[in-house]
Amino acid sequence: MYRKLQLHLTLIATLLLAGITTLKAQGKSMGNTKENTMEIAFILFNDYETLDVFGPAEIFGRLVNKYTLTFYSLEGGVVSNRHRVPIMTQKLEDMDKKPDMILVPGGLGTRKGVENKELISQIKELSLSSKYVLTVCTGSALLAKTGLLDNKKATSNKRAFSWVASQGLEVDWDKKARWVIDGKYYTSSGVSAGMDMALGFLADRHGIDFARKTAKEIEYNWAEDKNNDTFQAVE
């Protein structure tokens, strides 16, 4: 009797283990494992622009099987802005491993940020190690300050275009574009353009239909043409 019970328990354990192994294999084949997600590190500072962060965060953040969002700043702790939207961040120097990609927003804080050598150094280091680098609005001024955009195409907020361009005189600035791709670097125009760029990034990685489906889910009219910014004459 005891031996039969033992055999039954062994059989059940074997079947359970086989089932778990099969589920894990299926999860991996579907790309749903944590190991297959890309970490996007948002590099923040005080006086960041709200939608520069939360627009792309809404798009990438809802795709939990593909992207993981983390938030960092030089000092760590809470960063905020003129809209009084606080975000809890981790300290950049405490980063355990390099992220797959970074996103640098714009905002009034970039005016001080371009003079912050430590911030620029951290952005440069992370940009060099990341597979992709995204900037929104005047965030491209911070990236330009690193020198990594020299001889590359880029764009920025049209209302602050002249100031941003002055931060990278060797950059090939495109005033007409909604967003620009040059290698691993994605730079967008102002504020809401970060959402268009994020959807463009999804289209590049997962296909246009996937990006359109994501835009539809958030009830957003995606400006699909990256070469045509309707706000190009704003400045």
What residue ranges belong to the model's regions?
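NAD(P)-dependent dehydrogenases' Rossmann-like dinucleotide-binding region
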Residues: 159
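Extended, subdomain-level signal for the structured scaffold at the beginning of enzyme domains
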Residues: 2-7, 19, 23-133, 141-145, ...
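A short glycine-threonine-serine/GTX helix/turn-capping micro-motif
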Residues: 184-189
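The feature captures the short pre-catalytic strand/loop hairpin that immediately precedes
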Residues: 173-183
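Sec-dependent N-terminal signal peptides
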Residues: 8-15
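Anionic-ligand binding patches
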Residues: 154
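Short acidic alpha-helix initiation/capping motifs at coil-to-helix transition points
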Residues: 190-194
